[in-house]
C-alpha cells in the first residue's frame, strides 16, 4: 500500500511539474507571437503581408499561400537574413539565435496564412492553432490527453466551442512541447542546428521544416 501511495504521489508531482513547465513554455511562445506579429522595424504587418500576396494572386488563397511559403523558405535558408534578425528581435535565453530567427519567419508565415483564411490573430484559439502548426502537434491528440473525446479531426470551429479551461490545458501541452523541443538541450539533441554565432545555419533543415510547416498551415487555415 505504501509503495502504491508513493507511486501516486510521484506521478502527481510529475504531472504538476509538466503543468508548470507548460505554463512557462506558453509564456515564452506568447512573447515570440507578439514579437512576430509586431515585426522588426520597417517590416509590414502580418495582415498587410497576407493582403499583398492575395492581391498578387487575384484573391486565390491557396496560390497566395504557396507563393508566400516559397518566399519564407528562401528567408529561412539565407544566413545573412537570419543573422540580421538575431540582432533585432528579443529571444528567450534558452533559444539560440538561429532557431529564434527561423521561428520568427515561420510564425509570421503561419499567421499570414491564417489571415488569408479570414481568421483574427487576436483570437486565442487561432493563436493556439498557430503554435500547434509550428510544433507539428495534432490537436485531436491533445484533446484526448486533456479528457475531451472527439471522433473527428480537431478544427478551429470545434476548439471555439470548448470551455476556456480546455484551451488552457491545450496551451500548457503546447508550451511543454515547445520547451522539450527547443530548450537548449532539445536544440542540440532534436533539431541539430549549428548556432548563427558559429557562422553557419543548417539551411537544408530550415528549408524542409519551413516548407512542411507552410503546408500544414494551409490544411489548418485554408482547407475547411
Residue ranges and their predicted role:
Residues 1-85, 104-224:
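Terminal, membrane-proximal amphipathic helices
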Residues 92-100:
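Selective recognition of hydrophobic, aromatic-rich stretches within alpha-helical transmembrane segments
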